[in-house]
UniProtKB/Swiss-Prot annotation:
Subcellular location: Cell membrane
Gene3D superfamilies associated with the record: Rhodopsin 7-helix transmembrane proteins
Claim: Magnesium is one of the keywords in the record: no
Transmembrane segments: 34-54, 70-90, 121-141, 150-170, 193-213, 240-260, 285-305
Designated gene of the protein: GPR15
Subunit comment: Interacts with adapter YWHAE; this interaction promotes ER-to-Golgi transport of GPR15.
Gene source species: Macaca nemestrina
Membrane side Cytoplasmic: residue ranges: 55-69, 142-149, 214-239, 306-360
Lineage: Eukaryota, Metazoa, Chordata, Craniata, Vertebrata
PANTHER family: CELL ADHESION MOLECULE, G PROTEIN-COUPLED RECEPTOR 25
Protein name: G-protein coupled receptor 15
Function: G protein-coupled receptor that plays an important role in immune homeostasis. Acts via its natural ligand GPR15LG, a chemokine-like polypeptide strongly expressed in gastrointestinal tissues. GPR15-GPR15LG signaling axis regulates intestinal homeostasis and inflammation through the migration of immune cells. Controls thereby the specific homing of T-cells, particularly FOXP3+ regulatory T-cells (Tregs), to the large intestine lamina propria. Also required for skin localization of thymus-derived dendritic epidermal T-cells.
């Protein structure tokens, strides 16, 4: 195949490489053939083990299941499916970019990566909305925050994510450049670039705006609650800390890569490119591994900051510690906050009604 008809897949993640001149078979980052295989192997081992333990602990935990646990299990399943493809990328990096595992795995692994990316973003958005409803609207949200609704939402997310990943199967192919096999993206057409831009906006930046908005509203509500109740020291700090850690992990993992992807698409749509191809490729190479690493960090975040999940994991691995007290001061289930805020909102409504009756 003519090299001009393809662009080598150098961005490490499901994305269109819009510039046909990005075809270098070497990396702009030194020692990637040594560092990335080691890094991806570590991500694979820790991520597979961590997500398996997390899913098993929450699935087999006796007693009632929290609503947010349904989203966490699905998020862990999405990450686990992606992590299964990492050995293929380890081999790719170790062989200096060559794809030696055939056309089927070239298309299949790219499709699984695409599904994971969309599924993760949508699940994180739903988790943010769930926290918003639980903390900001605890009374009104009772009719929506049900187990059956959560299962329907998760099933819908998987279905939509699988559909959004289908273009990958059509655009990915195993191609030969200088008689060497590469898992490549076909040359981008203007229509394909426009689709990529629209998809990126609605599958990342809009969910990102929703996540940030939800957590800003949560933070404001928590501040108002603790100021009214007079308890705004440790509880407030821990609640806000958990919120910002979740948001920060999401931003650090996804924002650099998708920003580089956005710049690459915009550059491909312009007649005169304002962003050099080498800079765009370097941005993809540096930010891609961060997006990969996101799939292994979530179990550790939940273990450290959610005592409910920490208790479930320890009980799953060491049943003998069943009666051990793990504390609940940093639990992210928001149950104690929901009850407190419900009382707080009822008190506010009662005060407003009383003032209105007095004024009349």
């Amino acid at each position: 195949m003519d090299p001009e008809e393809t662009s080598v897949y150098l961005d490490y993640y499901y994305a269109t490489s819009p510039n046909p001149d990005i075809r270098e078979t070497h990396s702009h980052v030194p020692y990637t053939s040594v560092f990335l295989p080691v890094f991806y192997t570590a991500v694979f081992l820790t991520g597979v083990l961590g997500n398996l333990v997390l899913m098993g602990a929450l699935h087999f935990k006796p007693g009632s299941r929290r609503l947010i646990d349904i989203f966490i299990i699905n998020l862990a399943a999405s990450d686990f499916i992606f992590l299964v493809t990492l050995p293929l990328w380890v081999d790719k990096e170790a062989s200096l970019g060559l794809w030696r595992t055939g056309s089927f795995l070239c298309k299949g692994s790219s499709y699984m990566i695409s599904v994971n990316m969309h599924c993760s973003v949508f699940l994180l958005t739903c988790m943010s909305v769930d926290r918003y409803l639980a903390i900001v609207c605890p009374v009104v949200s009772r009719k929506f925050r049900r187990t059956d609704c959560a299962y329907v939402v998760c099933a819908s997310i998987w279905f939509i994510s699988c559909l959004l990943g289908l273009p990958t199967l059509l655009s990915r192919e195993l191609t030969l450049i200088d008689d060497k096999p590469y898992c490549a993206e076909k040359k981008a057409t203007p229509l394909k670039l426009i689709w990529s831009l629209v998809a990126l906006i609605f599958t990342f930046f809009v969910p990102l705006l929703s996540i940030v908005t939800c957590y800003c509203c949560i933070a404001r509500k928590l501040c108002a609650h603790y100021q009214q109740s007079g308890k705004h020291n440790k509880k407030l700090k821990k609640s806000i800390k958990i919120i910002f850690i979740v948001v920060a992990a999401f931003l650090v993992s996804w924002l650099p890569f998708n920003t580089s992807k956005l710049l690459a698409i915009v550059s491909g749509l312009q007649q005169e490119r304002y962003f050099p191809s080498a800079i765009l490729q370097l941005g993809m190479e540096v930010s891609g591994p961060l997006a990969f690493a996101n799939s292994c960090v979530n179990p550790f975040i939940y273990y450290i900051f959610d005592s409910y999940i920490r208790r479930a994991i320890v009980h799953c691995l060491c049943p003998c510690l069943k009666n051990y007290d793990f504390g609940s001061s940093t639990e992210t289930s928001d149950s104690h906050l929901t009850k407190a805020l419900s009382t707080f909102i009822h008190a506010e409504d009662f005060t407003r009604r009383r003032k209105r009756s007095v004024s009349l």
